[in-house]
Amino acid sequence: MSDRGQAFTLEAITASLLLIGGLVFALQATAVTPLSASTSSQHIENQQQAAAEGVLTTGLDDGSLRRALLYWNDSANDGSGGFHDAREEGYYVDKTPANAFGRSLNRTFTSRNIVVNVYVYYEEAGREKQQRMVYRGEPSDNAVSASTTVTLYEGARLYAEDGSPATTTITNDTFYAPNATSGGSYNTLRVELIAWRQ
């Protein structure tokens, strides 16, 4: 009986060594990482996408996006102005607008080294035209975008540099987007926000 017990013990030890050896081999043969590079990158892009959509939705809900669209300086009254305190191109290159929408962009993106471009699309003579609001360069391959629409109505007033409503109303001569409709609405603007990591 003792020979049989020794054989069973030897057999059990051999089986356990084979099992442990197989597990060690399997673990060494496969890489065990929490996220691969592409999965991690996709996760970051998903976060940026959600943030871009959130900024636009919040701006639409609290009115800051509409006010930013109307934050236009046309002191020459010829339609060729630009956003307040922007460079000579008429749009922001090295900063964001000095209003609630600009602060939201800074808080959400700029403070995290994420670059944004903001484009405003509008209809003119049946064709879509573009006005840059913020332009920081060409987006990278991993850029995300979100967009929303804002309808402006006839009689809407531009906003002064201090953020207060100005006396000037939007017309073809005072605003970048022309009156493209009739019946009370002035033009429907599509705002696109593109974000990418520097």
Language-model segments: residues:
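Long, compositionally biased, intrinsically disordered regions
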Residues: 27-198
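Secretory targeting signatures
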Residues: 1-35, 51-52
